[in-house]
A protein has these predicted regions:
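ATP/Mg2+ or Mg2+-diphosphate-binding catalytic cores
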Residues: 311-356
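Conserved phosphate-donor/acceptor-positioning beta-strand/loop module used by diverse small-molecule
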Residues: 452-472
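Small-molecule kinase domains that catalyze NTP-dependent phosphoryl transfer to phosphate-bearing small molecules
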Residues: 474-520
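Conserved ATP-binding subdomain of kinase catalytic cores across diverse folds
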Residues: 17-223, 228-304
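Hydrophobic positions on the alpha1 helix immediately C-terminal to the Walker A/P-loop
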Residues: 364
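Conserved lysine of the Walker
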Residues: 361
Length: 520
């Protein structure tokens, strides 16, 4: 019997289980109705306060759920992987049994014929893809998300094994083989064949760095399927669930490749500021040199993630009809074009934004950063944040006078420049956000840019005194300790630079940001 016939028979055998699970009387609580959600590899049945996940009897290029034994193993694997991180969601693995009377039951006596993961239900509007559509991914929630991902990666088992980066080869190979189909389905033309060649070249060129990061412990048992639909808000905190369970090679990966899926998902949805904030907060701690240098891999990782989404869409195209087929073809085209754009970012540059306290430096820096350089935008290095890291202080803790002494100020500027010197060679842009009151402070970033061979832009923000005073008075929970007295002292003793671009920052932040964009 052919493989296709075996798979058809497996699907036919499972049809009775699916019909059983659609009946309200099949469940202990007898819900009024049963809902159903279908994905490539699973059917999820929504019954009252619980959800039951059934692995579909399918065999695809990247997964094999064709027998009950394989479905049991993968259910147990998914439960073991996700329960530690989402204990409030994952309840147990449960058999669908057939009794002596031939009837199917949940967890009843008789022979197991299929397997389910029993989960707590949650409101759909708590999924992060729904929060994104509703415009509810604010800065505070993005920070929580970055911290949740960082905790997940910190707790993940390290795999220092030679299969990485070799395991990326088949993934890239599958993408390359799919390119002609993507060209045809998305009506792009022959452009994706050139992309396929470039993707292979990047993998070859990055082998040494990929291996070095593996040896440094940055290849771990990651989530593997980290996008917005697999994150839910539980008790006000992001909860990662549905980690990839069917192929260890797809999950034993570089932590930055894991994060890249989430960054790409945000970027593809047009949430550029959110993607930028996520990456910046993920790296807001003091990172090791190998972590910074790994940023050179990010364009490749992001591009590969987008190309894989195009390939997965191509797999589903034969089953789509009518308007759904046209929509899927458009989505494939979007992902393919995004993959191509992500692989070849603009070159790096160094930008210094100076000005007295209250001129809006940090707000403007965050506003323009997503539009600058490699996706998801320029790294913003802020002196107030570096000062707190240097002194081990939290964001709500007011620093003492010694933190602002000349030696401390010089040390803060050195930290800014050291981090910029680590980031710029990876191809990413950097924005330095500091007052830059002293001439020697302004000379240092320019000298760094010249040493690294990247363009430099110095911007000096100016605003009326009353505007600056109003802004510092309105700050809440900000990293800066500056108040009205600081602003007044700065006004008395600061001479603006003559060789930086002066920008009027008295208007709203977006208007000031528009002025800076014209300089870029």
């Amino acid at each position: 019997m052919s493989r296709a016939a075996n798979i058809r028979d497996a699907a036919a055998d499972q049809a009775a289980v699916i019909a059983f699970l659609m009946l309200p009387e099949s469940y202990p609580d007898r819900p009024a109705e049963v809902g159903r959600i279908d994905t490539h590899g699973a059917a999820i049945f929504l019954a009252g306060g619980l959800a039951y996940k059934l692995k579909r009897a399918v065999k695809l290029a990247y997964l094999d759920f064709s027998t009950p034994e394989k479905r049991k193993a993968v259910c147990e694997r998914e439960f073991a992987l996700n329960r530690p991180h989402a204990p409030k969601l994952y309840r147990r693995v449960l058999a669908v049994t057939r009794g002596d009377d031939g009837a199917l039951r949940l967890g009843g006596p008789g022979e197991p014929v299929d397997w389910l993961i029993e989960m707590e239900r949650f409101a759909d509007d708590r999924l992060f893809d729904r929060l994104a559509v509703a415009g509810r991914l604010d800065a505070a929630l993005i920070e929580k998300l970055a911290e949740a991902v960082e905790r997940f990666h910190a707790a993940a088992p390290v795999f220092n094994e030679p299969r990485w980066p070799a395991s990326l080869g088949p993934i890239v190979g599958n993408v390359v083989r799919a390119m002609s189909g993507i060209d045809q389905a998305a009506r792009i033309g022959a452009g994706m064949q050139g992309y396929a060649t470039a993707l292979q070249e990047r993998l070859y060129g990055h082998r040494a760095l990929l291996s070095e990061r593996r040896d440094a412990g940055l290849v771990r048992r990651c989530h593997g399927d980290l996008h917005l639909k697999n994150i839910v808000l539980i008790d006000g905190a992001p909860c990662l669930f549905d980690a990839l369970e069917f192929d260890e090679d797809l999950a034993r990966i570089d932590v930055l490749y894991d994060l890249a899926f989430l960054l790409m998902d945000l970027w593809h949805r047009g949430l550029k500021a959110e993607a930028h904030a996520l990456l910046n907060h993920y790296f807001s701690r003091d990172a090791a040199d190998i972590e910074w240098r790994g940023l050179a891999l990010l364009p490749f990782f992001l591009s590969l993630r987008a190309a894989i989404r195009a390939m997965v869409g191509l797999d589903g195209l034969p089953l789509a009809e009518g308007g759904k087929r046209a929509a899927l073809a458009a989505e494939i085209r979007d992902y393919a074009q995004l993959a191509e754009a992500l692989l070849s970012p603009a070159p790096p540059m160094l930008i210094a934004i100076g000005g007295l306290s209250g001129t809006g430096k940090s707000t403007v820096a965050r506003a323009i950063a997503p539009d600058i350089g490699a996706t998801p935008g320029a790294f913003v290095l802020r002196s107030d944040v570096e000062r707190r890291l240097m002194h081990g202080a939290g964001s709500a803790e007011r620093l003492g006078a010694d933190a602002y002494a000349p030696e401390s100020r010089n040390a803060v500027y050195s930290r800014l420049l050291d981090k910029a010197a680590a980031i710029l060679p990876t191809g990413h842009c950097v924005i330095l956000d500091a007052v830059f009151r002293e001439p020697h402070q302004r000379e240092r970033p320019k000298a760094l840019a010249e040493r690294l061979g990247v363009p430099f832009l110095g911007v000096w923000l100016e605003a009326p005194q009353e505007r600056m005073l109003a802004r510092v008075a309105a700050r809440r929970g900000d990293a800066s300790d500056a108040d009205a007295s600081v602003v007044l002292r700065q006004l008395e003793s600061t001479v603006p630079p003559s060789d930086w671009h002066k920008v009027d920052a008295s208007d709203a932040a977006e208007e000031t940001a528009s002025k800076l964009r014209t300089l870029l």
